[in-house]
Amino acid sequence: MMAKTKGSYEVFHYTVTKDKVNKGLCDIARYFVPEYRNSKDEDLTIQKLNGGITNVLYLVEDKNIEQKYRYLPVVIRLYGYKSEEIIDRKNELIIQTEADQNGLGAKFYGLFDNGCIYGFIKGEPLAYEDISKPTMQTCIAKEIAQWHSIEMPTRKNPSLWPTIKKWAALAPDVYPVPEKNEYYQSINVKKMIEEGKMLEQRLAQLNSPIVFCHNDLLSGNIIYDPSQNCASFIDFEYANYNFRGLELGNHFNEYAGFGPDYSLYPNKESQIHFLTDYHRSLFKTEPTQDELEKLYIESNQFSLASHLYWGFWAIVQAMNSQIDFDYLEYGKARFDRYYETRDQFLNLN
């Protein structure tokens, strides 16, 4: 249980084990949070949070402590099994600490051997049914614009295609669970890899700007604070520099939820409302019709890349994750949606 300070965060050499999760979470909270230093196990309440399909999240709170501190209670994230194969933890750490120092996101307390701990952002995580509401769209669009306007001390090369290729290379020829191999073969991974090559060339023609992106704006990663009428983003695991169109198109895909129900994909009117608020917040000017049309085409064409990104992600997760979620079915749903919309979106002009 040795600890050391590194930059503006601490590293605690401690592993939360499966057989003693609650005890481990209490130890982590006591170590990192000064206000909880003297809290006993029975003082700390632990609530498992919904929404994560890469890691497991817990809210830890001492209800005896006056809630005047900005980032109490705290969230403890336990990394998913072999999640380091899909997450660049070093890059995530740089982004997490920089975001904390720039007031973007929650206070970051530090790392332990199989997870991290950060402050709780006041508000409610949105449900996928919420993010299509016009008032929520405005809040989310403004926050995305803020993200896209900041500078981070990481490489400014877009991470989309290298990440897709990395994950695709991890996809097996034969699925390791024999009874699921026939279903896996129906996905036709090799064909999806070829689609990725074609799409990379097509989307390059859009010259989508490279900006700092969250890259995972599903509803559960968006916290709405009604007292301030604003949205904040959490969970920066996939954050990196990327194409603007990917951030926007990926978010529109998330209207469908984990189901996913793509009948909920936003129509053009809904997208234009969102993109208008985004443009106003980012550029401080009213967008022209041509600018909105360009954003609309860019977003929808990059939504195709989002399906490839999360489709290959799901295949890797299906082989490794111990979270109760049907990743293989989800991955196939993303690839199926890619084919359903490919020609329609690539023909937009």
UniProtKB/Swiss-Prot annotation:
Arranged from A to Z, the UniProt key words for this protein are: ATP-binding, Cytoplasm, Kinase, Lipid biosynthesis, Lipid metabolism, Nucleotide-binding, Phospholipid biosynthesis, Phospholipid metabolism, Transferase
- Give, as one word, the top-level EC class: transferase
> What is the protein name stated in its UniProt record?
Probable ethanolamine kinase A
Q: Which SUPFAM superfamilies match?
A: Protein kinase-like (PK-like)
* Record's GO cellular component terms: cytoplasm
Judging by the UniProt lineage, the source's domain of life is: Eukaryota
Q: Indicate where this protein resides in the cell.
A: Cytoplasm
Q: Is Transferase included in the keywords of this UniProt record?
A: yes
BP GO annotations: phosphatidylethanolamine biosynthetic process
This enzyme catalyses: ethanolamine + ATP = phosphoethanolamine + ADP + H(+)
Q: Which family would the database say this protein is a member of?
A: Belongs to the choline/ethanolamine kinase family.
Q: In which pathway does it act?
A: Phospholipid metabolism; phosphatidylethanolamine biosynthesis; phosphatidylethanolamine from ethanolamine: step 1/3
Q: What does this protein do?
A: Highly specific for ethanolamine phosphorylation. May be a rate-controlling step in phosphatidylethanolamine biosynthesis.
Primary residence: cytoplasm
Pfam families registered for this protein in UniProt: Choline_kinase
EC number(s) stated in the UniProt entry for this protein: 2.7.1.82
Q: Show the InterPro entries listed in the entry.
A: Kinase-like_dom_sf
- Molecular function per GO: ATP binding; ethanolamine kinase activity
